[in-house]
Amino acid sequence: MWPLWPLAALLALSQALPFEQKAFWDFTLDDGLPMLNDEEASGAETTSGIPDLDSLPPTYSAMCPFGCHCHLRVVQCSDLGLKAVPKEISPDTTLLDLQNNDISELRKDDFKGLQHLYALVLVNNKISKIHEKAFSPLRKLQKLYISKNHLVEIPPNLPSSLVELRIHDNRIRKVPKGVFSGLRNMNCIEMGGNPLENSGFEPGAFDGLKLNYLRISEAKLTGIPKDLPETLNELHLDHNKIQAIELEDLLRYSKLYRLGLGHNQIRMIENGSLSFLPTLRELHLDNNKLSRVPAGLPDLKLLQVVYLHTNNITKVGVNDFCPVGFGVKRAYYNGISLFNNPVPYWEVQPATFRCVTDRLAIQFGNYKK
Protein backbone atom coordinates (compact mmCIF):
# COMPACT_ATOMS: atom_id res chain seq x y z
CA MET A 1 0.00 0.00 0.00
CA TRP A 2 1.33 3.42 -0.93
CA PRO A 3 2.11 5.80 1.94
CA LEU A 4 -0.64 8.38 2.03
CA TRP A 5 0.98 11.59 3.20
CA PRO A 6 2.42 12.70 -0.22
CA LEU A 7 -0.73 12.07 -2.27
CA ALA A 8 -2.43 15.39 -1.68
CA ALA A 9 0.73 17.34 -2.44
CA LEU A 10 1.41 15.37 -5.62
CA LEU A 11 -2.12 15.83 -6.90
CA ALA A 12 -1.87 19.57 -6.42
CA LEU A 13 1.20 19.60 -8.67
CA SER A 14 -0.31 17.37 -11.34
CA GLN A 15 -0.29 18.49 -14.97
CA ALA A 16 -3.32 17.96 -17.17
CA LEU A 17 -1.60 15.63 -19.60
CA PRO A 18 -3.28 12.25 -19.30
CA PHE A 19 -1.45 10.42 -22.07
CA GLU A 20 -1.76 6.98 -20.52
CA GLN A 21 -3.69 5.56 -17.62
CA LYS A 22 -1.37 3.94 -15.09
CA ALA A 23 -1.16 3.59 -11.34
CA PHE A 24 -2.33 6.31 -8.96
CA TRP A 25 1.11 7.90 -8.71
CA ASP A 26 1.24 8.29 -12.49
CA PHE A 27 -1.82 10.51 -12.49
CA THR A 28 0.53 13.27 -11.38
CA LEU A 29 3.23 12.80 -13.98
CA ASP A 30 3.81 14.72 -17.20
CA ASP A 31 5.73 13.21 -20.12
CA GLY A 32 5.53 16.17 -22.44
CA LEU A 33 5.44 19.95 -22.67
CA PRO A 34 4.08 21.57 -19.50
CA MET A 35 0.46 22.59 -19.60
CA LEU A 36 -0.95 25.81 -18.27
CA ASN A 37 -2.08 25.42 -14.70
CA ASP A 38 -5.79 25.13 -14.11
CA GLU A 39 -6.32 28.78 -13.24
CA GLU A 40 -4.36 30.10 -16.22
CA ALA A 41 -5.95 27.71 -18.70
CA SER A 42 -9.54 28.05 -17.65
CA GLY A 43 -9.57 31.70 -16.68
CA ALA A 44 -11.42 30.67 -13.54
CA GLU A 45 -11.19 32.86 -10.50
CA THR A 46 -11.03 29.92 -8.15
CA THR A 47 -7.68 28.44 -7.16
CA SER A 48 -6.48 25.33 -8.97
CA GLY A 49 -4.73 23.57 -6.11
CA ILE A 50 -6.07 21.57 -3.20
CA PRO A 51 -8.22 23.76 -0.96
CA ASP A 52 -6.51 25.52 1.92
CA LEU A 53 -6.48 22.87 4.63
CA ASP A 54 -6.60 25.51 7.36
CA SER A 55 -10.00 26.64 6.10
CA LEU A 56 -11.50 23.17 6.45
CA PRO A 57 -13.00 21.59 9.56
CA PRO A 58 -10.78 19.37 11.72
CA THR A 59 -10.12 15.82 10.48
CA TYR A 60 -12.53 13.22 11.81
CA SER A 61 -9.86 10.58 12.24
CA ALA A 62 -12.31 8.07 13.71
CA MET A 63 -14.25 7.94 10.42
CA CYS A 64 -12.52 5.61 8.00
CA PRO A 65 -14.20 2.86 5.97
CA PHE A 66 -13.20 -0.68 6.90
CA GLY A 67 -10.07 -1.81 5.06
CA CYS A 68 -9.23 1.69 3.79
CA HIS A 69 -6.32 3.91 4.75
CA CYS A 70 -7.15 7.44 5.86
CA HIS A 71 -4.69 10.22 6.53
CA LEU A 72 -4.55 13.99 6.01
CA ARG A 73 -8.00 14.12 4.40
CA VAL A 74 -7.00 11.40 1.92
CA VAL A 75 -9.10 8.23 1.85
CA GLN A 76 -7.56 5.36 -0.08
CA CYS A 77 -9.81 2.37 -0.71
CA SER A 78 -8.19 0.92 -3.84
CA ASP A 79 -7.73 -2.79 -4.62
CA LEU A 80 -10.23 -4.00 -2.02
CA GLY A 81 -12.78 -5.75 -4.23
CA LEU A 82 -15.46 -3.25 -3.23
CA LYS A 83 -18.89 -3.68 -4.83
CA ALA A 84 -20.13 -0.22 -3.85
CA VAL A 85 -18.85 3.13 -2.61
CA PRO A 86 -18.10 2.64 1.11
CA LYS A 87 -19.93 4.48 3.88
CA GLU A 88 -18.43 6.41 6.80
CA ILE A 89 -16.22 8.63 4.66
CA SER A 90 -15.15 11.71 6.59
CA PRO A 91 -16.92 14.88 5.36
CA ASP A 92 -13.62 16.77 5.23
CA THR A 93 -12.09 14.33 2.70
CA THR A 94 -10.41 16.06 -0.24
CA LEU A 95 -9.14 13.01 -2.14
CA LEU A 96 -11.03 9.73 -2.48
CA ASP A 97 -9.27 6.84 -4.24
CA LEU A 98 -11.56 3.96 -5.25
CA GLN A 99 -9.66 2.58 -8.22
CA ASN A 100 -9.24 -1.11 -9.02
CA ASN A 101 -12.46 -2.34 -7.40
CA ASP A 102 -15.69 -3.97 -8.62
CA ILE A 103 -18.05 -1.01 -8.25
CA SER A 104 -20.78 -1.21 -10.91
CA GLU A 105 -23.07 1.68 -9.97
CA LEU A 106 -22.87 5.16 -8.46
CA ARG A 107 -26.04 5.82 -6.47
CA LYS A 108 -27.74 9.05 -5.49
CA ASP A 109 -26.32 9.32 -1.96
CA ASP A 110 -22.92 7.64 -2.46
CA PHE A 111 -21.08 10.95 -2.05
CA LYS A 112 -23.50 12.69 0.30
CA GLY A 113 -21.77 15.15 2.62
CA LEU A 114 -18.46 15.20 0.72
CA GLN A 115 -18.68 18.88 -0.09
CA HIS A 116 -14.90 19.38 0.24
CA LEU A 117 -13.89 16.60 -2.18
CA TYR A 118 -11.31 17.86 -4.69
CA ALA A 119 -10.38 14.64 -6.55
CA LEU A 120 -12.32 11.43 -7.12
CA VAL A 121 -10.54 8.38 -8.57
CA LEU A 122 -12.79 5.60 -9.91
CA VAL A 123 -10.46 4.09 -12.50
CA ASN A 124 -10.72 0.40 -13.39
CA ASN A 125 -14.06 -0.54 -11.91
CA LYS A 126 -17.18 -1.91 -13.60
CA ILE A 127 -19.29 1.24 -13.51
CA SER A 128 -22.10 1.18 -16.07
CA LYS A 129 -24.77 3.22 -14.28
CA ILE A 130 -24.55 6.64 -12.62
CA HIS A 131 -27.54 8.28 -10.94
CA GLU A 132 -28.27 11.72 -12.36
CA LYS A 133 -27.71 13.27 -8.90
CA ALA A 134 -24.73 11.16 -7.83
CA PHE A 135 -22.28 14.05 -8.18
CA SER A 136 -24.61 16.77 -6.83
CA PRO A 137 -22.94 17.02 -3.38
CA LEU A 138 -19.47 17.48 -4.92
CA ARG A 139 -19.53 21.25 -5.24
CA LYS A 140 -15.73 21.60 -5.12
CA LEU A 141 -14.73 18.60 -7.25
CA GLN A 142 -12.05 19.53 -9.78
CA LYS A 143 -10.63 16.19 -10.93
CA LEU A 144 -12.76 13.18 -11.91
CA TYR A 145 -10.93 10.06 -13.09
CA ILE A 146 -13.44 7.46 -14.26
CA SER A 147 -11.48 5.70 -17.01
CA LYS A 148 -11.54 1.96 -17.68
CA ASN A 149 -15.15 1.33 -16.78
CA HIS A 150 -18.28 0.22 -18.69
CA LEU A 151 -19.87 3.60 -19.35
CA VAL A 152 -21.84 4.03 -22.58
CA GLU A 153 -22.46 7.76 -22.13
CA ILE A 154 -20.91 10.85 -20.57
CA PRO A 155 -22.16 11.08 -16.97
CA PRO A 156 -25.00 13.60 -16.58
CA ASN A 157 -24.89 16.68 -14.37
CA LEU A 158 -21.15 16.88 -13.83
CA PRO A 159 -20.09 19.39 -11.13
CA SER A 160 -19.64 22.91 -12.49
CA SER A 161 -16.36 23.14 -10.56
CA LEU A 162 -14.79 20.35 -12.65
CA VAL A 163 -11.44 21.16 -14.28
CA GLU A 164 -10.23 17.77 -15.49
CA LEU A 165 -12.21 14.76 -16.75
CA ARG A 166 -10.58 11.46 -17.65
CA ILE A 167 -13.11 9.10 -19.14
CA HIS A 168 -11.06 7.11 -21.63
CA ASP A 169 -11.34 3.36 -22.18
CA ASN A 170 -15.09 3.11 -21.77
CA ARG A 171 -17.84 2.24 -24.28
CA ILE A 172 -19.01 5.72 -25.22
CA ARG A 173 -20.26 6.10 -28.80
CA LYS A 174 -22.04 9.44 -28.63
CA VAL A 175 -21.33 12.93 -27.25
CA PRO A 176 -24.66 14.78 -27.27
CA LYS A 177 -25.17 18.51 -27.35
CA GLY A 178 -25.37 20.02 -23.88
CA VAL A 179 -23.62 17.21 -22.03
CA PHE A 180 -20.88 19.65 -20.95
CA SER A 181 -23.23 22.56 -20.33
CA GLY A 182 -22.20 24.81 -17.44
CA LEU A 183 -18.65 23.45 -17.15
CA ARG A 184 -16.98 26.82 -17.59
CA ASN A 185 -13.91 25.78 -15.55
CA MET A 186 -13.11 22.64 -17.54
CA ASN A 187 -9.75 22.75 -19.34
CA CYS A 188 -8.82 19.09 -19.88
CA ILE A 189 -10.74 16.10 -21.24
CA GLU A 190 -9.21 12.70 -21.96
CA MET A 191 -11.75 10.55 -23.82
CA GLY A 192 -9.66 8.24 -25.97
CA GLY A 193 -10.18 4.51 -26.12
CA ASN A 194 -13.92 4.86 -26.78
CA PRO A 195 -15.59 3.62 -30.00
CA LEU A 196 -16.34 7.18 -31.13
CA GLU A 197 -16.92 7.95 -34.80
CA ASN A 198 -17.15 11.43 -36.32
CA SER A 199 -20.92 11.08 -36.46
CA GLY A 200 -20.97 10.45 -32.72
CA PHE A 201 -20.33 14.12 -31.94
CA GLU A 202 -23.55 16.08 -32.15
CA PRO A 203 -23.23 19.67 -33.44
CA GLY A 204 -22.57 21.88 -30.44
CA ALA A 205 -21.42 19.01 -28.23
CA PHE A 206 -18.54 21.12 -26.91
CA ASP A 207 -20.39 24.45 -26.80
CA GLY A 208 -19.37 26.62 -23.86
CA LEU A 209 -16.16 24.73 -23.11
CA LYS A 210 -12.84 26.58 -23.08
CA LEU A 211 -10.64 23.52 -23.21
CA ASN A 212 -6.88 23.69 -23.16
CA TYR A 213 -6.31 19.97 -23.79
CA LEU A 214 -8.33 17.27 -25.57
CA ARG A 215 -7.40 13.70 -26.43
CA ILE A 216 -9.61 11.45 -28.57
CA SER A 217 -7.06 8.80 -29.46
CA GLU A 218 -7.70 5.11 -30.15
CA ALA A 219 -11.20 5.80 -31.44
CA LYS A 220 -12.81 5.38 -34.88
CA LEU A 221 -12.40 8.85 -36.33
CA THR A 222 -11.95 9.06 -40.10
CA GLY A 223 -11.37 12.82 -40.16
CA ILE A 224 -10.49 15.72 -37.89
CA PRO A 225 -13.64 16.84 -36.04
CA LYS A 226 -14.53 20.40 -37.06
CA ASP A 227 -16.58 21.48 -34.04
CA LEU A 228 -14.11 21.14 -31.17
CA PRO A 229 -13.35 24.10 -28.85
CA GLU A 230 -11.35 26.78 -30.63
CA THR A 231 -9.45 27.48 -27.40
CA LEU A 232 -7.46 24.23 -27.65
CA ASN A 233 -3.68 24.34 -27.16
CA GLU A 234 -3.26 20.57 -27.45
CA LEU A 235 -5.23 18.16 -29.61
CA HIS A 236 -4.36 14.46 -29.77
CA LEU A 237 -6.09 12.29 -32.36
CA ASP A 238 -3.49 9.55 -32.68
CA HIS A 239 -4.41 5.90 -33.34
CA ASN A 240 -7.51 6.63 -35.40
CA LYS A 241 -8.43 6.05 -39.06
CA ILE A 242 -7.90 9.55 -40.42
CA GLN A 243 -6.94 9.42 -44.11
CA ALA A 244 -6.45 13.06 -45.09
CA ILE A 245 -6.15 16.60 -43.79
CA GLU A 246 -8.23 18.89 -45.95
CA LEU A 247 -7.85 22.64 -46.32
CA GLU A 248 -10.33 23.78 -43.67
CA ASP A 249 -9.95 20.92 -41.20
CA LEU A 250 -7.70 22.99 -38.92
CA LEU A 251 -9.22 26.40 -39.58
CA ARG A 252 -10.84 26.56 -36.15
CA TYR A 253 -7.76 25.57 -34.16
CA SER A 254 -5.39 28.51 -34.57
CA LYS A 255 -4.25 28.37 -30.92
CA LEU A 256 -2.78 24.87 -31.11
CA TYR A 257 0.82 24.42 -30.06
CA ARG A 258 0.80 20.62 -30.09
CA LEU A 259 -1.05 18.44 -32.61
CA GLY A 260 -0.92 14.65 -32.45
CA LEU A 261 -1.93 12.71 -35.57
CA GLY A 262 0.41 9.75 -35.35
CA HIS A 263 -0.70 6.18 -36.14
CA ASN A 264 -3.42 7.08 -38.61
CA GLN A 265 -3.77 6.39 -42.35
CA ILE A 266 -2.99 9.88 -43.63
CA ARG A 267 -1.87 9.93 -47.27
CA MET A 268 -2.60 13.53 -48.15
CA ILE A 269 -2.24 16.90 -46.43
CA GLU A 270 -3.77 19.58 -48.60
CA ASN A 271 -1.55 22.57 -49.37
CA GLY A 272 -2.31 25.46 -47.05
CA SER A 273 -4.03 23.41 -44.37
CA LEU A 274 -1.17 23.92 -41.89
CA SER A 275 -1.17 27.69 -42.41
CA PHE A 276 -4.03 27.98 -39.90
CA LEU A 277 -1.68 26.92 -37.08
CA PRO A 278 0.64 29.93 -36.56
CA THR A 279 1.53 29.01 -32.95
CA LEU A 280 2.22 25.30 -33.57
CA ARG A 281 5.37 24.03 -31.86
CA GLU A 282 5.06 20.25 -32.12
CA LEU A 283 3.54 18.13 -34.90
CA HIS A 284 3.20 14.34 -34.77
CA LEU A 285 2.60 12.69 -38.16
CA ASP A 286 4.54 9.49 -37.59
CA ASN A 287 3.22 6.07 -38.62
CA ASN A 288 1.06 7.28 -41.48
CA LYS A 289 1.21 6.83 -45.28
CA LEU A 290 2.70 10.14 -46.38
CA SER A 291 4.83 10.04 -49.53
CA ARG A 292 6.39 13.48 -49.02
CA VAL A 293 7.11 16.07 -46.37
CA PRO A 294 3.94 18.14 -45.81
CA ALA A 295 3.91 21.51 -47.51
CA GLY A 296 3.91 24.61 -45.36
CA LEU A 297 6.33 23.62 -42.60
CA PRO A 298 8.76 26.49 -43.36
CA ASP A 299 5.97 28.98 -42.72
CA LEU A 300 5.39 27.77 -39.16
CA LYS A 301 7.75 30.16 -37.39
CA LEU A 302 7.47 28.53 -33.95
CA LEU A 303 7.58 24.88 -35.03
CA GLN A 304 10.35 23.01 -33.20
CA VAL A 305 9.47 19.29 -33.33
CA VAL A 306 8.21 17.25 -36.30
CA TYR A 307 7.67 13.49 -36.18
CA LEU A 308 7.56 12.00 -39.69
CA HIS A 309 9.08 8.59 -39.07
CA THR A 310 7.50 5.40 -40.41
CA ASN A 311 5.88 6.86 -43.51
CA ASN A 312 6.51 6.38 -47.25
CA ILE A 313 8.59 9.51 -47.82
CA THR A 314 11.07 9.01 -50.68
CA LYS A 315 12.52 12.50 -51.05
CA VAL A 316 13.39 15.46 -48.83
CA GLY A 317 13.78 18.83 -50.55
CA VAL A 318 16.20 21.54 -49.49
CA ASN A 319 13.33 23.88 -48.53
CA ASP A 320 10.94 21.34 -47.01
CA PHE A 321 11.63 22.39 -43.42
CA CYS A 322 13.38 25.76 -43.37
CA PRO A 323 12.30 29.11 -44.85
CA VAL A 324 14.39 30.77 -47.51
CA GLY A 325 16.65 33.38 -45.93
CA PHE A 326 17.58 34.05 -42.32
CA GLY A 327 15.68 35.72 -39.51
CA VAL A 328 12.31 34.44 -40.66
CA LYS A 329 11.97 31.52 -38.26
CA ARG A 330 11.55 32.54 -34.62
CA ALA A 331 12.42 29.13 -33.13
CA TYR A 332 14.86 26.59 -34.55
CA TYR A 333 14.01 22.90 -34.75
CA ASN A 334 15.28 20.70 -31.95
CA GLY A 335 13.77 17.48 -33.25
CA ILE A 336 13.03 16.09 -36.74
CA SER A 337 12.41 12.35 -37.08
CA LEU A 338 12.58 10.81 -40.56
CA PHE A 339 13.75 7.30 -39.77
CA ASN A 340 11.99 4.28 -41.26
CA ASN A 341 11.22 6.07 -44.54
CA PRO A 342 12.53 4.96 -47.97
CA VAL A 343 14.44 8.23 -48.43
CA PRO A 344 18.14 7.91 -49.38
CA TYR A 345 19.50 10.09 -46.61
CA TRP A 346 22.91 10.45 -48.31
CA GLU A 347 21.20 12.41 -51.09
CA VAL A 348 19.69 14.99 -48.73
CA GLN A 349 21.53 18.30 -48.95
CA PRO A 350 23.05 19.60 -45.69
CA ALA A 351 21.34 22.97 -46.23
CA THR A 352 18.00 21.21 -45.78
CA PHE A 353 18.53 21.43 -42.03
CA ARG A 354 20.00 24.92 -41.82
CA CYS A 355 17.41 25.92 -39.20
CA VAL A 356 18.05 22.98 -36.87
CA THR A 357 19.82 23.57 -33.55
CA ASP A 358 22.06 20.51 -33.72
CA ARG A 359 22.69 17.66 -36.16
CA LEU A 360 21.81 15.20 -33.38
CA ALA A 361 18.27 16.54 -33.55
CA ILE A 362 17.82 14.84 -36.96
CA GLN A 363 16.94 11.14 -37.00
CA PHE A 364 17.45 9.22 -40.24
CA GLY A 365 17.91 5.64 -41.37
CA ASN A 366 16.71 2.21 -40.22
CA TYR A 367 14.37 1.67 -43.17
CA LYS A 368 13.35 -1.89 -43.93
CA LYS A 369 11.32 -2.95 -46.96
Swiss-Prot record:
SMART domains: LRR_BAC (SM00364), LRR_TYP (SM00369), LRRNT (SM00013). May be involved in collagen fiber assembly. Pfam families: LRR_8, LRRNT. GO terms for molecular function: cytokine binding; extracellular matrix binding; glycosaminoglycan binding. LRR repeats lie at residues 83-103, 104-127, 128-151, 152-172, 173-196, 197-221, 222-242, 243-266, 267-290, 291-313, 314-343, 344-369. Keywords: Disulfide bond, Extracellular matrix, Glycoprotein, Leucine-rich repeat, Proteoglycan, Repeat, Secreted, Signal. The keyword Glycoprotein applies. SUPFAM superfamilies: L domain-like (SSF52058). Gene3D superfamilies: Ribonuclease Inhibitor. GO terms for biological process: articular cartilage development; bone development. Belongs to the small leucine-rich proteoglycan (SLRP) family. SLRP class I subfamily. Residues 17-37 form a propeptide. GO terms for cellular component: cell surface; extracellular matrix; extracellular region; extracellular space; sarcolemma; transport vesicle. This is Biglycan. It comes from the Eukaryota. Residues 1-16 form the signal peptide. Coiled coil: none annotated. Found in several connective tissues, especially in articular cartilages. It is found in: Secreted, Extracellular space, Extracellular matrix. The two attached glycosaminoglycan chains can be either chondroitin sulfate or dermatan sulfate. It comes from Bos taurus. Disulfide bonds join C64-C70, C68-C77, C322-C355. Homodimer. Forms a ternary complex with MFAP2 and ELN. Glycans are attached at S42, S48, S181, S199, N271, N312.
